[in-house]
Structure formats: structure tokens, C-alpha cells
């Protein structure tokens, strides 16, 4: 049997064991309109469970630690441990193959995330439109989320590439090729 349970997300299991919880952010408190009502309620319940039951709280940054303290979590339980990094070596041939498969012939700006309101994609797209003279494409990687998807609107098809979710190998190539 485990000596400790580590909940790496807000999906906190019931347990009588010591409990460590990773809190990636508390954005639902700062920008509740960027979440569904169901999502906001879920996160509030998880925050309350964290407040009552956590024996240790892991956060990725000092900013998140400060937000957690402001949200009522015990500062003495919080430890900052930055998110890890996975270095996947990518060859020039792999990048060339990736770019050819996705018809990426020009240099590009890469955005990776879930396409949903809290990611503020409309602002990125508006900024990109102001760069129309730049010889840069915009590559959007990641799945559609909830709410309106700004990529449903007409985009410059030869300059804005919506790739959707990529496997790890292609994602590494997308980063390396940007």
C-alpha cells in the first residue's frame, strides 16, 4: 500500500493516507468567466478539499504559491517545484518531414494550448493580423476546448495553420521547427 497519495491535478481521490496535491494555477478565481459554471464549481470544491485535507501542496511557480496563499491555503504547506522539461532530440530531417507534411514553407510563430476562452486566442489572432507584412506564418497546435473557438472564423488559410492535437514526436518537431 502507498505511504502517501499525490494528486497531480484537482482530481483528488478520497484517502486516509497523507496527501500531496499539485496546484497548477487558480485561474478560476481570477477569471471565472473563462470557465464553465460546472468547471468553476468543480475547482472551488477541489480548492476546499485542498484547504482541508492537503498535507503538502506543490506549485510550479512563486506566483502560483502567492495566489494559493491569497486563496486561503496554508503557506507552510506550499513548496515551489517548477514543471519538468522533457528534451526530445529532433533531427533536421524530422523537422523537414514535419514541415512538408503540414505545408509549412515559411518561418512560423508557434502557439500550443487548448483553444478555449481563457487562452485569449482572439488577442493573438488580432496581433498576428497586424503583422500581415511579416514573412511569418502562425501555427496553432492543440485541441478545441469549450466555448467559442476563434479558429472557426475565417483565417488566412495560407498563413494560419490549425494543426489540432499532435503526438509527442510531432509536437517536438513543431517546437524545433519554429
Task: List the predicted regions and their residue ranges.
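Carbohydrate transferase catalytic cores enriched for Leloir-type hexosyltransferases
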Residues: 1-178
Amino acid at each position: 500500500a502507498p505511504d502517501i497519495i499525490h494528486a497531480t491535478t484537482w482530481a483528488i481521490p478520497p484517502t486516509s493516507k497523507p496527501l500531496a496535491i499539485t496546484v497548477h494555477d487558480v485561474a478560476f478565481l481570477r477569471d471565472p468567466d473563462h470557465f464553465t459554471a460546472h468547471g468553476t464549481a468543480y475547482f472551488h470544491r477541489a480548492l476546499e478539499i485542498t484547504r482541508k485535507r492537503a498535507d503538502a501542496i506543490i506549485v510550479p511557480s512563486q506566483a502560483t504559491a502567492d495566489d494559493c496563499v491569497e486563496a486561503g491555503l496554508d503557506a507552510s504547506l506550499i513548496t515551489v517545484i517548477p514543471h519538468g522539461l522533457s528534451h526530445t532530440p529532433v533531427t533536421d530531417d524530422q523537422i523537414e518531414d514535419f514541415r512538408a507534411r503540414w505545408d509549412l514553407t515559411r518561418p512560423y510563430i508557434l502557439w500550443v494550448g487548448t483553444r478555449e476562452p481563457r487562452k485569449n486566442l482572439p488577442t493573438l489572432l488580432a496581433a498576428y493580423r497586424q503583422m500581415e507584412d511579416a514573412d511569418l506564418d502562425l501555427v496553432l497546435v492543440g485541441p478545441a476546448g469549450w466555448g467559442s473557438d476563434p479558429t472557426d472564423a475565417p483565417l488566412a488559410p495560407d498563413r494560419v495553420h490549425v494543426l489540432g492535437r499532435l503526438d509527442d514526436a510531432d509536437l517536438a518537431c513543431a517546437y524545433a521547427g519554429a
